[in-house]
Amino acid sequence: IILDFFSGSATTAHSVFLANIEQNLNRRFILVQIPELIDASKGSEKSKKVAKNAINLLDSMKVPHTICEIGKERIRRAGAKIKEENPEKAQKLDKGFRVLKLDSSNMKEVFYSPKETTQQDLFALVDNVKDDRTSKDLLFQVMLELGATLDSKIEESEVDGKTIYNIGDGYLVACFDQEVSDDVVKAIAKMQPTYAVLRDTGMADDATATNFEQIFK
């Protein structure tokens, strides 16, 4: 695994793709970059022009003016170009990548003293997940907590209108939707996961929650 801190425009990723093709290897990479804004007002005239062109590209993509966005687009284009120029060698080239961002906890602050806690607060804390967090946010948190690597294969399926995530061929199976039915619980059980995770408040009713506990006891 090649690790590149302050990876800029992702030249390392581009180079790894090329080396993998030339040497028939499967090296992987981790790139780390602060989402620094591109400034077209500083530096030489040449660097200003390069920065302006980058900003114009990002505007056309309707994404923020950061070096990270340039890096992501370079990885996409580099992978596509290499596959186009080396159709036979590139058949097994994995040009996919996953973008993760550092953030605060998905959980609400729940450390209150008895004097600070009202009856209304207790009801509000029944579901302690922050309102702006998505199922994917929760999924990656659980993956880290349960020891699944962040590059693990993620498969999505749908049962009874609910999304089920299968991580690492059954190592972890999770569903973070609300109103999860008995059919969803049974579908998860059939996958025989090492770990099965649902939201505390996600069960459709008490009977479903009891069934889940009995199945995975």
Task: Enumerate the language-model features and the residues they cover.
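Conserved class I S-adenosyl-L-methionine
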Residues: 1-8
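Glycine-rich SAM-binding Motif I of class I
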Residues: 10-14
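Accessory, often C-terminal, charged low-complexity segments
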Residues: 1, 19-217
